[in-house]
Amino acid sequence: DDDGRHYFLNMLFDWRLENPGFAGTVIQEFDAKARRLVGQRRHFYKGTALGVCEGPQILKKDGWYYLLCAAGGTGYSHAATVARARSLDGPWEDSPYMPLMTTKDDPSNPLQKSGHCCFLHKGEDWYVTQICARPLTQRGNCILGRETALQKIEWVDGWPRLANGTHHPELSVEVEADVLTPVCTDHSETVTFAPDRSLPVSFKTLRV
């Protein structure tokens, strides 16, 4: 925070047999020097009707705390939600443009399962990264598993909103040349193997 204090946010899970599931978000102060949690853990946000409130993170901007959460699970109901408050103690107000992002109502969108966003900005230009997947057929298998994409956002009446005015992500987004700095190096290679042999171990990975 502005005063140098740190906080740890986490999803709360309800293990009771009669009502198992996600139960909102908790916050606790983190002592950076001692590298441990201190003080009382507080349950401070219950989530939305989309359910499965997880992956919480907070941005402070213009005197507001913005709580960005993943919602709906990581399947085809995946979404991102935003709430804000003047204090970490609340009260928290859900965005009128809820959800910030989802494709649960847009099965033809190429970036399915979109949600779990993270804010970033370059000067006055604001963006969110997102988790998504590209199915081979409508709502079918996604052979590349989870992928990462970028969307441009605008601030409308103090709320973040996708720049296209909807909550549906776009496949192509224009950004300034200096916004994204490549960090990958060229690791291309040519591999030759016989059709009746096993794939090289470098071709194998866990399915996500």
Segments from the language model and where they lie:
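Carbohydrate-active catalytic/glycan-binding domains of CAZyme proteins
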Residues: 1-208
